[in-house]
């Protein structure tokens, strides 16, 4: 990801719930810097520069670079969980699975810059912050695991390893954030493709 120009992808509107405006600019700058350079290689000066602020001004709003990463991770994981909860609709487990995977994949494509950070910089979080994010990650896994279990129960899915298959389905969607660029594919079309692939993985 190093050297990738992603700054034009992260819209400040993502952080419209954050006050004041300076804090929003810092979050936008942090996402872009972390996605482009990686958490460890990013300095507070990098982030402040992208926000049009001095390094000292960053600490007025966030006590550390890690705190910025935590805020980004918290937002990204909660947003992804809400996408799954909203998409868990349909008369059959197959319909629900396709809806879930389609929405989850499209989200990771549309928000690939944020998703890169929240998925691949987890190790940089403090133990306390990591534990909080891990709780949300378990809820995300549960959304997929439940629909797979329902499909096994009614005989429409052939799944012998429920946790392993859950991880495989989630990984399919999440990995989109690693390679996605806007010119590669339409998020909705990609979601449909991955929904088909996930269904084929588990159908009887």
PLM features: what roles do these ranges have?
Residues 116-120, 130, 134, 152-197:
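Hydrophobic/aromatic-rich alpha-helical bundle segments in the mid-to-C-terminal region
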Residues 106-145, 178:
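Short secondary-structure transition hinges
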């Amino acid at each position: 990801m190093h050297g990738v120009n992603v700054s034009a992808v992260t819209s400040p509107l993502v952080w419209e719930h954050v006050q004041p405006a300076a804090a929003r600019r810092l979050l936008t700058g942090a996402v872009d810097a972390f996605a482009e350079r990686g958490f460890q290689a990013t300095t507070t000066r990098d982030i402040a520069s992208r926000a049009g602020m001095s390094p000292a001004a960053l600490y007025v709003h966030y006590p550390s670079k890690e705190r910025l990463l935590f805020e980004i991770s918290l937002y990204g994981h909660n947003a992804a969980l809400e996408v799954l909860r909203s998409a868990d609709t349909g008369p059959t487990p197959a319909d629900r699975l396709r809806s879930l995977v389609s929405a989850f994949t499209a989200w990771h494509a549309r928000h690939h810059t944020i998703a890169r950070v929240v998925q691949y910089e987890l190790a940089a979080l403090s133990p306390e912050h990591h534990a909080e994010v891990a709780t949300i990650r378990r809820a995300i896994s549960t959304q997929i695991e439940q629909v797979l279990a329902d499909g096994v129960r009614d005989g429409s899915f052939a799944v012998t390893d429920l946790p392993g298959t859950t991880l495989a389905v989630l990984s399919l969607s999440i990995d989109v954030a690693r390679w996605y660029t806007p010119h590669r594919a339409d998020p909705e079309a990609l979601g449909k493709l991955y929904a088909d692939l996930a269904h084929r993985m588990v159908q009887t």
